[in-house]
Regions:
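Transmembrane beta-strands of outer-membrane beta-barrel proteins
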Residues: 24-28, 57, 69-73, 111-117, ...
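Transmembrane beta-strands of outer-membrane beta-barrel pores
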Residues: 30-36, 63, 75-81, 119-125, ...
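Residues on the lipid-exposed face of transmembrane beta-strands in outer-membrane beta-barrel proteins
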Residues: 57-63, 100-104, 117-119, 146-152, ...
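Residues that define the transmembrane beta-barrel architecture of outer-membrane proteins
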Residues: 22-24, 51-55, 94-98, 111, ...
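Short glycine/proline- and aromatic-enriched beta-strand/turn motifs that initiate or cap beta-hairpins
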Residues: 20-81
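Outer-membrane beta-barrel translocator domains and adjoining extracellular loop/strand segments
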Residues: 38-45, 82-89, 125-134, 172-178, ...
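Outer-membrane beta-barrel "beta-signal"
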Residues: 25, 32, 218-230
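Gram-negative (and chloroplast) outer-membrane scaffold detector with strong preference
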Residues: 65-159, 188
Length: 230
């Protein structure tokens, strides 16, 4: 069923008369995400994660060719560990997330909206020590994703607001990733736009593995960063 919905969305996107960029453009984003969260396996107590700082990066390419989708890649490192570790209870997370997205612009005025689809890759290891019993989860899966973003610009102020969501569901991993931000463009000309932004991001991951309890992870926290548009 998920495969049928995913295919239908791709066909709908490709056949619709959807807006596109007026010129070729390149967008890049670099942010510092200060997150905490928790790790919990079935039938075990929740273990809070120590607050960490990490880089979250994205790059997008847009063009004026009708029906051909734009492309975007998002990356974040999710390495973390438990806030309070003991010889019997601890969590160690070594995890990377990359989203490969093809999307279309539905609107591109003072109000903008994009919708797309693609693949997400979660790759790494989660080690849960609970009551002295160690369970290791080895994650490496490409899952289909759905992508949407919407935002609004306040004319003549340089201010804008945006919300973005990614949802993926594969055979063993489900992920929900939502973020919202405010941005101020302090450089705005024909060559380049540069903005400073502040936002909040929440990512939830549910994973299954043979002969292991189901795993639930949450990462959440504020971020600050720069956005550049050529």
């Amino acid at each position: 069923m998920r495969t049928q919905l995913f295919t239908a969305l791709l066909l709908g996107l490709g056949l619709s008369s959807i807006g596109h960029a007026d010129v070729i453009g390149l967008k890049a984003d670099a942010s510092y995400w200060n997150f905490d969260g928790y790790s919990q396996s079935a039938n075990a107590s929740k273990q809070d994660l120590d607050r960490q700082g990490t880089a979250q990066l994205s790059v997008a390419f847009e063009h004026p060719v009708p029906l051909l989708p734009n492309a975007k890649i998002k990356y974040v490192n999710l390495d973390s560990n438990s806030e309070q570790s003991t010889p019997l209870n601890a969590v160690d997370i070594e995890l990377n997330n990359i989203d490969y997205i093809l999307y279309y612009e539905l609107l591109d005025t003072i109000v903008h909206a994009d919708i797309g689809a693609g693949l997400t890759n979660l790759d790494g290891t989660v080690r849960n020590l609970n009551a002295g019993a160690l369970t290791q989860y080895d994650l490496d899966e490409y899952s289909p994703l759905l992508y949407a973003t919407a935002g609004v610009k306040l004319p003549f102020t340089g201010m804008s607001a945006k919300a973005e969501a990614v949802y993926s569901h594969g055979s063993d991993i489900k992920k929900t990733d939502v973020q919202a931000e405010l941005q101020y463009d302090f450089i705005d000309n024909l060559l380049v736009d540069v903005g400073a932004k502040v936002g909040y991001r929440i990512m939830n991951i549910d994973a299954e593995q043979n002969n292991a309890p189901d795993l639930e992870l949450e990462f959440k926290g504020p971020y600050i960063g720069l956005d550049i548009h050529f």
